[in-house]
Amino acid sequence: MTDEPQPPEEAREERLARKEVLFRSVNEAIEQQALEFGGLDEYEFICECARSGCFERISLTLRQYEHVRAEGTRFFVVPGHQDVAVELVVETESGFVIVEKDGHAGVVADLADPRGGN
């Protein structure tokens, strides 16, 4: 966020948050297509975890998707993909877990929220 060197843990948190933010932006595009074409009860979104190489799919309704997007620090992940070092599990649903970034990762996620942050 600044040009000063970050403590190693803060740099790790930022790197993980930025990966999840990237997948959030992909899922925003999926939602826009779903809204444009409609017709399905559930849509396939990409797991928003920070695991390298994870492209697992999660089925959500648009209502569930909007529920997660209501908070700029929240993401949905496949159960077991949460990283307790940088996020808290706030809800467990059938087929996915909603996590919330905290600390520096939460700041990064909220600032990068395409819906304006909170």
How would you label these PLM feature ranges?
Residues 2-118:
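Polybasic/polar functional segments that serve as interface/processing modules
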